[in-house]
Amino acid sequence: MPGGTPRLEGHPFSKTGPDPATPGAATMPDSPADVKTQPRSTPPNMPPPPPAVTQGATRHPSFTPSTMMNGSSHSPTAINGAPSTPNGFSNGPATSSSASLSTHQLPPACGARQLSKLKRFLTTLQQFGNDISPEIGERVRTLVLGLVNSTLTIEEFHAKLQEATNFPLRPFVIPFLKANLPLLQRELLHCARMAKQSPAQYLAQHEQLLLDANASSPIDSSELLLEVSESGKRRTPDRTKENGLDRDPLHPEHLSKRPCTMSPAQRYSPSNGLSHPPNGLPHPPGPPPQHYRLEDMAMAHHYRDAYRHADPRERPRPAVHGARQEEVIDHRLTDREWAEEWKHLNNLLNCIMDMVEKTRRSLTVLRRCQEADREELNHWIRRYSDAEDMKKGSPPSARPHNSSSSSEAPQLDVHRDFAPRPLSGYMPEEIWRKAEEAVNEVKRQAMSELQKAVSDAERKAHELITTERAKMERALAEAKRQASEDALTVINQQEDSSESCWNCGRKASETCSGCNTARYCGSFCQHKDWEKHHHVCGQTLQGLPAPSVPTAVGQPEAVPPMASSPSDAGSAGASRAGTPGTPAPLESASR
């Protein structure tokens, strides 16, 4: 693991490999193909190798002591094989060509390996959190994204990670992160620039590129976390794996992953040399392209174009071994980036021009609507003035003389109120006030018309009710008259009958002593029927002599004849005093 005591690691073919320029030299599958063999102790100011051996030497990085990060130094980029990695972990697809951003500081293979280690480290942390619980795994994922996005410092990440997992990390973690995290952040920044996004947006959309469990072989979590029984000491790593002797038949999974360490950007790298095809020397071909990641393909195209069309500002600059040129990459723009910037500026100016044109059209439409509103306001004010003149109702004699003046006055008011004014003195409040007055006048007229309609409807309803009431009263009067006629008919029928009582209709046993015509069943019915009978009693005896009529007790001597008319009957009834007594025949019968 990185972070231990600095030491030199041996590579099977890093010091004494055969010269690739020799035609008859045998080449091992895992040996570098086109890198000139040179000892590790080469000084920084040593002149570059001949062009026949290394193509594009101006971009070839130097092997200075600054390249020994975390105590591990590695060989240059391998073309057809997988260089040995510490702890025997194969880089896999995680050796992204985007790691070549750090080639001005580290050798390409070293930068790619450090990025691969960092990604495996972060992936292992997340898997360890998921093994504890899904909640802790989510918290660890959030902390990792915050660390890569630079929203958390390394110390804050370290403290919060220990708080979330309750496991202390090994001492080498913080130096490892401080040494390798800038590489990952520069890779993220460059990928985000290519995708025209911010680093946070790019990381949110391509999170699987950072935390992909299948991208590389995860590290054992016990190598990152301290155990209680170890008393703060980490276990000794396997020296055979660190020395690259991991090609054991017991580890076939590394052999299956080894062809994927060749990214497209490394195939098109100028350090490969033009004398070799992209697939390299006799080596089994790699897996299909779908095993590469998207960022590998994008970075391959980017660097291929960058090497084909080199920046003319960089051509006269010779390569200075050991010099740091990250500022040039970060702050200087290539012709392609300048073209993109000018394209963005052009689009922005076009958008601004479109907005200005739309604003002008909107102002024109508003001005036309304002003129139409003025005309409609003038129309309503003219109608209002005419209605006011009609309401005032000037005398007929004065109306012809005053009509012209009264019609001119509203026109003058209208022109005075709505005359075209300069834009500076134009008050929208007056327009709104006059518009509200016109609308209120229309409302008042509508309400007056509605009230008139309601009053007319009420009047018609009252008339209809009165007519119906008169009809009902006439019907009731007719019914009463019909009932009285029916009663008289019944009485007449009773008068014709001599055997039934005139009051109740039962069998009669007595006769009225006044007229000797009315028949009753008893004195009760005679008294009950007296109110109706006294009008006709005695009319049949007008031609008879008076002494023949028996007199009753308390009854007058002579009964005056009843008039046939209702007035005579009323006067005759008034002249009679009280109710007649029981006739003599009735008294004799009762005895």
Curated annotation (Swiss-Prot):
The record's PANTHER family line, in alphabetical order, gives: MTG8 ETO EIGHT TWENTY ONE PROTEIN (PTHR10379), PROTEIN CBFA2T3 (PTHR10379:SF6)
Q: Where is the composition biased (Low complexity)?
A: 394-410, 560-585
Main subcellular location: nucleus
User: Zinc finger regions typed MYND-type: which residues?
Assistant: 501-537
Q: Please list where the region (Disordered) is annotated.
A: 1-105, 226-291, 386-420, 548-591
Q: What is this protein's function per UniProt? A: Functions as a transcriptional repressor. Regulates the proliferation and the differentiation of erythroid progenitors. Plays a role in granulocyte differentiation. May also function as an A-kinase-anchoring protein.
Q: Which residues form a coiled coil?
A: 433-488
Q: What is this protein called?
A: Protein CBFA2T3
Alphabetic keyword roster: Coiled coil, Differentiation, Golgi apparatus, Metal-binding, Nucleus, Repressor, Transcription, Transcription regulation, Zinc, Zinc-finger
- Basic and acidic residues bias located where? 230-256
Give the species.
Gallus gallus
Q: Which GO terms describe its biological process?
A: cell differentiation; DNA-templated transcription; negative regulation of DNA-templated transcription
Origin superkingdom: Eukaryota
Which Gene3D superfamilies does its entry note? 6.10.140.2220, 6.10.250.230, TAFH/NHR1 domain
The residue ranges of the TAFH domain are 112-207
Pfam families in alphabetical order: NHR2, TAFH, zf-MYND
* Bias (Pro residues): 41-52, 279-290
Q: Which family does it belong to?
A: Belongs to the CBFA2T family.
Binding-site positions, Zn(2+) 1: C501, C504, C521, C525
What GO terms are given for molecular function?
transcription corepressor activity; zinc ion binding
Binding-site list for Zn(2+) 2: C512, C515, H533, C537
Stored PROSITE patterns = TAFH, ZF_MYND_1, ZF_MYND_2
